[in-house]
Amino acid sequence: IDAAIKELNYIPNANARSLKSKQTYTIGLVIPDIVMYSSICYYIESQLYENGYNVIICNTNFDHIRENKSLNSLLERRVDGLILATSGQNEQLIKRFEKSGIPVVLFDRMQPTLKGNYILEKHEQCIVTMTEYLIENNHKNIAYIKGPKSSYVSEFRFGKFKEILKKNSID
């Protein structure tokens, strides 16, 4: 059999194998910006590869419609897991992953209404440290450029920023 496999250059069908094993050995990684998340993509892909998994990277360009299409495509492909930095507007679709038994890990974004695992930076500590640094250095006209209102993290950071300014009597 081994000689025939070698002679015919036989390549096993991954789809057929996944039907039997009930695993695709594929993880979906959905990110809003490939440039901003390139390092994280590299490390996630490297770790998954070392553990026998392939990664489908979906770059949504901060477009919730594109994110929706990417999530649907990953569901159709029966990925074994989903790692996601969500726009925050596809909650029902993400819940479909959970209902299907597909593990979901959300990173860099918080969706308080979703169960699951989160990997988050210390958003509160970061915004407090940055804002207090500016205030301690006597800056009074501090501008804040924030992300979309649909982003829980963006709104959380902005709320903390305003709270610190108010506490320091800065308009």
Which stretches of residues belong to each language-model region?
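N-terminal helix-turn-helix DNA-binding module of bacterial transcription factors
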Residues: I1-Y25
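Bacterial carbohydrate/catabolite-sensing allosteric modules
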Residues: K6-N9, Y43-I56, K69-R78, E91, ...
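Short beta->alpha connector loops
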Residues: Y10, D33-M36, N61-H64, A85-N90
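Functionally critical, cavity-lining and gating residues within the transmembrane helices
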Residues: P12, Y37, F158
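Short, composition-biased local secondary-structure segments
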Residues: N13-N15, C41, T60-I65
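Conserved beta-strand edge residues that scaffold enzyme active sites
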Residues: L19, D33, F62, G88, ...
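Short beta-strand segments enriched in small/hydrophobic residues
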Residues: L19-I40, Y133, N141-P148
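Intrinsically disordered, low-complexity polar regions and short flexible loop motifs
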Residues: L82
